[in-house]
């Protein structure tokens, strides 16, 4: 008995299903939601980069851009629409294997950071931005102001 007839296109009613943007992906990839830079459009399957304010934008390969990963949701049909003064979020399958909370030893901007080898409160690794934005395996996903009276902010850091 033939289960599949090669002459049959398997479309009995309607139209052929259009191809999806993301065909297959590893289910164990790390996903993270990001706010989208105002005025930018992100679509599913698009490569995205970290903007200097911690939001994401389309990756173009321009000098200094920090590639994060591939968008798995989009701004056209977001899972959660922007509400009140809160922007639209897009989920990204990031190029990394873990997200950690590190302490900002100094004022930190979103971008490449390095651990300093010291701990904050005997628990969180301290970090600081790399010199001149040099690439590293660690990316601060949010910024932090300069610590006041020895109290550091915890910031999410993507480790590649």
Each PLM stretch: what is its role?
Residues 1-160:
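Glycine-anchored, exposed beta-strand/edge motif detector
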